[in-house]
Amino acid sequence: DEIAEWRALMASPILQRLFGAVLGVDLPERLFINAWRLRAGDFFAVHPDGRLYRATLTLGLCHGWTASDGGAIAFGDPTAQGFVVRERWLPHLGDALLFAVSVDSWHTVEPVLTDKPRLSLTGWWTSR
């Protein structure tokens, strides 16, 4: 199935070394994988992925997705006035997002604003 293939790809030693070199981090062998289907109104609150996570790889699976559909992964900084967004990534079909994770890598998945489902595969390299 597709999730098993995604896991095998992320577990590939060559890919781990390549992505680790790009990010400047050693990627552990342990993986946590999820398939996401978000519907209108669904979102993830602002959060860092935490101290046990090293890197995240997300694959967009949405054909024809636009900014007006919402559901962007937004990176930024929490402030007293709210979350200040620095950049956004949309889950376009075939687009991948790779980022190093730290206790300061604040991000959110913004609310989905369309009746189309927001689909993605995400994997995290974790130390435990």
Question: Regions from the language model: what does each represent?
Answer:
Residues 43-47:
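Charged, often glycine-rich, active-site loop that binds/positions anionic groups
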Residues 39:
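Acidic/His metal-coordination segments adjacent to aromatic residues that form catalytic metal sites
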Residues 3-7, 56-61, 125-126:
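Short, Φ-rich (hydrophobic/aromatic) sequence segments
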Residues 24-34, 69:
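A short coil-to-beta-strand element that immediately follows conserved catalytic motifs
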Residues 11, 23-24, 62, 66:
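Hydrophobic/aromatic-lined pockets within catalytic cores
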